[in-house]
Amino acid sequence: MTLSPETVAKAQNALPFAMSFLLIPLAIVSAIFGGWTVILLPVVTWYMFSIMDLAVGLNTDNADLEATDDDLFWYRMITVFWVPAQFLMLFGLIAYVAPAEHLNTLEKIAIFFGVGVITGTVGINYSHELMHQKNKLERWLGDALLAMVLYSHFRSEHLLVHHRYVATPRDPVTARMNETFYRFYPRVLKQCFMSAWNAEKAMLARKDLPVTDSSNPFWKYAYLQLVCFLLAFALGGWVGVGLFVLQAGVAIWQLELVNYIEHYGLTRKHLGDGKYEHVQPRHSWNAAHKASNWLLINLQRHSDHHYKPDRRFPVLQNYTEADAPQLPYGYPVMTIAAMMPKVWKRVMNPRVQKWRDMYYPEITDWSAYNKAANPLPR
């Protein structure tokens, strides 16, 4: 069913996407009470939303593409107001937890592991929505969220590399067939930073500017991250810095788990001479699970996001199996499966093979695609 702009614009239809704000009180409860409450954040984020997916099912409705930014006001406010909310939660908890005598070391670690689940699952995801906008304020807010998890270069890598080269050998975050997450993760950590740096360097070179020019966003990335480090130290000393770095590490791990899932085994056809077919919905895994899409502001409609990157999350379209490959479960379940390589391959490899047979029956030798050994795109 297609939802009219008038229907989409109603505040009550945006409200389910604000469920992520309910995670912040759980973080506060964990810090105040300690004990078993320190597991609330990962349990709710990973398992409760998975149970909700089973309860509420799929959402295959699509918003009318004629919906304007004014129609999407309430949805936009969710991503904008998350930024100060996360800032206050993160640094407020550093100030409270670092010197807290009622919490032992393991409890403090567990609390900030949970905080990293939030800043990764929600914060980085919201930064992804914000960085794609033309509005300078929204883009700056996206940078602020990434600085809080020490992963600012993700913006450059995502916009300049991933979207341009997805499903080709030049894209570091397209997971290869049979590549486990444990091989994917260290490879991506190394390659993404360098690909982001090289992309910005190339852009400056085209303007006859050196890489040290003040317009290089890496200066801003460094400044924002330094501010976060200094604030963590001012509020919690070296313990505060340690807790800040811990949550950042967890957040980055959460992001790259999602990156691993989104394009696993999917490749664009090499047309020869370093040329590849255009990106289509079939080059990203789609998931229509309603509750986890509330949490992730429709990130699981990833097929449409790559097909039309300028669409805001409320108007991202769902695709059927005829147009895009489908994940069997939402991201919370799939990220858990990704941590277990045998389970992951048992679930996903047959689906990749089905995708290949469906869209590319003419390709009989996939070895170069599996190893990302085809020529780099021009």
What are these regions (language model features)?
Residues 121-125, 244, 294, 298, ...:
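Short alpha-helical catalytic segment bearing the HExxH-like zincin motif
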Residues 54-68, 267:
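Membrane-helix interface/capping segments
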Residues 104-109, 239-243, 276-287:
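Short, motif-level signal for alpha-helix interfacial/capping segments enriched in acidic residues
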Residues 64-189:
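Intramembrane catalytic core of multi-pass membrane enzymes that act on lipidic substrates
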Residues 2-19, 23-28, 135-138, 143, ...:
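Cytosolic/stromal cytosol-facing helical appendages immediately following the last transmembrane segment
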